[in-house]
């Protein structure tokens, strides 16, 4: 998928189609990349089902989607602050940066409260759009949701895929894609 290609996956669109439709893996491609694509596809399927139901955003919903995104590629991390499992959607208990020596994201201790705030903010705007649909406002909400979630960076891995998934979730919910 394009979302995993941004993350560095070398699996092409045609190879993904064969993987999704026929269960045929791409010769010479890393298994982790193929698993990443299968997991993301399942996350999109769950997300679209919830979008059709107009399910309210919650931290548990986000963690559940993250668990699907990271199901086969996540890991257990043991840190001084505790243990967490990215394949279960657990929030990070460590600091993270954008690449080696890159920008630091917010302190992990702030993440739970920021995610609650994020969900309340998104739900308030979603509810307004459900009452008075406006395609421009729906697009803006989806872009804002992507930007806010990737800025919070709640997980140790999969933040980009999750942020794009949530952006697409909102676009799907409001009939834009």
Protein language model regions, located:
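FIC/Doc superfamily catalytic core
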Residues: 1-177
């Amino acid at each position: 998928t394009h979302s995993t290609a941004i993350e560095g996956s070398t699996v092409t669109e045609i190879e993904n189609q064969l993987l999704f439709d026929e269960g045929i893996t791409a010769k010479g491609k890393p298994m982790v990349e193929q698993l990443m694509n299968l997991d993301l596809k399942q996350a999109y399927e769950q997300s679209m089902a919830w979008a059709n139901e107009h399910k309210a955003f919650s931290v548990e919903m986000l963690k559940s989607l993250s668990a699907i995104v990271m199901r086969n590629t996540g890991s257990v991390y043991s840190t001084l602050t505790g243990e967490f499992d990215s394949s279960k959607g657990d929030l990070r208990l460590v600091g993270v940066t954008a690449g080696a020596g890159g920008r630091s994201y917010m302190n992990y201790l702030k993440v739970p409260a920021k995610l609650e705030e994020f969900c309340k903010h998104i739900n308030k705007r979603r509810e307004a759009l459900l009452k008075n649909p406006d395609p421009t406002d729906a697009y803006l909400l989806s872009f804002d949701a992507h930007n806010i979630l990737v800025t919070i960076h709640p997980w140790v891995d999969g933040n980009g895929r999750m942020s794009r998934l949530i952006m697409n979730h909102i676009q799907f919910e409001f009939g834009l894609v």
